[in-house]
Structures are given as structure tokens and as C-alpha cells.
Amino acid sequence: MQIKEAKPLNFLYFRTKTRIGELGRFVGVIAQELYRDAVRYDLEITGPVYWSYQGFTGRDSDPFTLDIALPLAELPGSYHGMFQLKREDAFPCVSMIHEGSWVGLQNSYARILEFMTEQGLEGSGKFREVYINIDFMNPTGNVTELQVGIHPESFERFRHVPADGVPAYASW
């Protein structure tokens, strides 16, 4: 587990309002369309698929905003595809690598939230999942970075600059 500031990113993204029970219909489908659109418009993809959740409470009946996104090298001056473009600011967060089936994501999130409570870190209400490796045939091969947003004030308490001038962050 690590407290870090994810760097600002450009995204090609899809946004929807949804609930937990509806997430399955987006798996694989939207990412594939994002890749197609990026290739069609010659957009340089610079990383794996991101899923971002805003307003997520963990309760089945509560709606939240879901963004499914691909990071891009730059935002094009002209784009007429089927998705949206945005630049996201730096994202202070508690990060953890989850290896294996996504069925176990809930337990990994519980560990992060427990850690945040122990450390007195205030959540920002935003969650991100970075799908480093997706293996539908062998889910134990999945590698997902979980990022739980924290308020900048919480992040600043943990940040320090060592003698060589390179920022370093606490890691557990």
C-alpha cells in the first residue's frame, strides 16, 4: 500500500450514471470501443484502461458516476468521435496493487479504507481502478491498481522531500 500523487493525465472517456449491479454490462465492451475510436482518430494511447467512480457508496441501490477511460499522449485539437476528452489533475490517493480475480476487489478496498481510517486520511469520494493486466480466461492473472482519492490536505501531511530533492511518499 502506498500514499502517492498520481500524475495529471489526458483521457478519452465514456461516462454514465449506473449502479453496482449494472457494472457487468460495461466490462470489456466499452474499453474495446474506446480503443477502436482512438485508433480511428489516430490518438496515441499511453497506458491501460481506467475506471473512475465518483459518488460511490458501496450500497447496491445508490447510483454513482462511472468513467471508463484510456490515457492519451495529448488532447487533440479536433476530435469528432463518439466519446469525450478531458485532462485530469494530479490525483492524491492511497494505492494498492490487487492481483487476481476481481471478486476479491471488495476485500482489497476494505484494507485501503481501514488503513485510511488508521492514518486519519480523509477520502475525496473518488475511486480509480487501473487495469494493468486483464485476463478473462485466467482471472488469477489480473493485475489491478486500486486508487482511493484523498483530500490534498491529508496528502500533504505524508509528503516529504529527501536530501536529493526527489519527492518520496510513505509506503506500507
Language model features with spans:
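A solvent-exposed interaction/effector surface
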Residues: 1-172
